[in-house]
Amino acid sequence: MGVIGIQLVVTMVMASVMQKIIPHYSLARWLLCNGSLRWYQHPSEEELRILAGKQQKGKSKKDRKYNGHIENKPLTIPKDIDLHLETKSVTEVDTLALHYFPEYQWLVDFTVAATIVYLVTEVYYSFMKPTQEMNISLVWCLLVLSFAIKVLFSLTTHYFKVEDGGERSVCVTFGFFFFVKAMAVLIVTENYLEFGLETGFTNFSDSAMQFLEKQGLESQGPVSKLTFKFFLAVFCSLIGAFLTFPGLRLAQMHLDALNMATEKITQTLLHINFLAPLFMVLLWVKPITKDYIMNPPLGRESVPLMTEATFDTLRLWLIILLCVLRLAMMRSHLQAYLNLAQKCVDQMKKEAGRISTVELQKMVARVFYYLCVIALQYVAPLVMLLHMTLLLKTLGNHSWGIYPEAAFPLPVDNNLPANSAYPELPSPDGKMKVTVTQITVALSSLKNIFTPLLFRGLLSFLTWWIAACLFSTSLFGLFYHQYLTVA
């Protein structure tokens, strides 16, 4: 069935499903409109008049007249008014007015489609074990990551358009902080953080040098280690800046969800969900993984509990389970955000003075209209973690089995095919075969340059970095909302 075969059929079927079925059955829409989320409606001006004890006024002498029309003063009411907001379940009609709803729906539904394609491809590879096919599910995962980063970039740019500049300063500050943090992490020896980045880069550099030598080119390598780490740190600083406000918002929703939760099991799950990025970070700390998990000290001797391959598999499964937990707790966090409308009204009642009815209505309505922005800030990091883990499993040559039958060897053989390996076919009909052979040899050379060692080190670091950024920003947000703001 060609170069891609069955995988191409799966991709075409999924594209058809996205076009025909998802507009009618959408997970993104169901997460918001399943009846569990309730939003607060802003009161009408007539209701506010009745609560304030004011009657509908006609034209009075106090009204100022400009150019033939009457300009009424804005209606104001006391801030300590006895106002109780009415709630309503989120419906599909309500979502039409939400900011960023199309982006939210596209990201979630495309992620679901990409995950299904990945699962089908994994089943296909486990049974058929093809060796000459391109794994097209990797393209889907890369597209998901690109869409998630694009959405986070779009949300971050809005903070730079605000005239006050407070949010812009926060993004820039955290960006520089994460750049310094990334440079510090990249110079730490692998005795503490076992990404395998040093080994992977060394293997990549040696393979690239050997490939260039076989092409008759003299080179000391494609890029120096310092340059590689510098550009990687710049990329990490951008990721950290994009994840700044999602982490800060998560901290506020976590505190509100804890106050809203009444059952102990819900509170426990909320705590685990908040600490999930920390658990992911600790999975790559070598003193913990090597000394206490893989080789726990039992008496005077340390007994090997599992192999490195088994621990790598357990690490993948744990990250996926924590991602599933975060998705399951999404409803609690979004409802905690929607409750901010009533919380703002309660806070207003404690203040003295008056407020215009228009400002009050905007204050209440603004919470619901930005629901999808908050949902994107919650979902996008989750999507990045999940599909970065899937890429790590496939490109890093890991296994899903806890006890694999045989270890998956990492190809480190640098014997690359030479230029003269192309067979010469003098007949004109053989030109197509020559082209196919050249493409095959080129792909084989690329596989020998970009080895699983490189992908394992790079993707392990990026997965760890996303979790570290989330935990750092959410921890700062927890401290800020708990101690630096007035409740």
UniProtKB/Swiss-Prot annotation:
Keyword Transcription regulation included in the entry's annotation: no
Membrane topology term: Multi-pass membrane protein
Coiled coil: none
Gene Ontology CC, one term: plasma membrane
Source domain of life: Eukaryota
GO biological process: regulation of cardiac muscle cell action potential; regulation of heart rate
Alphabetical keyword list: Cell membrane, Glycoprotein, Membrane, Transmembrane, Transmembrane helix
Pfam families, alphabetized: Tmemb_161AB (PF10268)
Protein name: Transmembrane protein 161B
Gene name of the record: Tmem161b
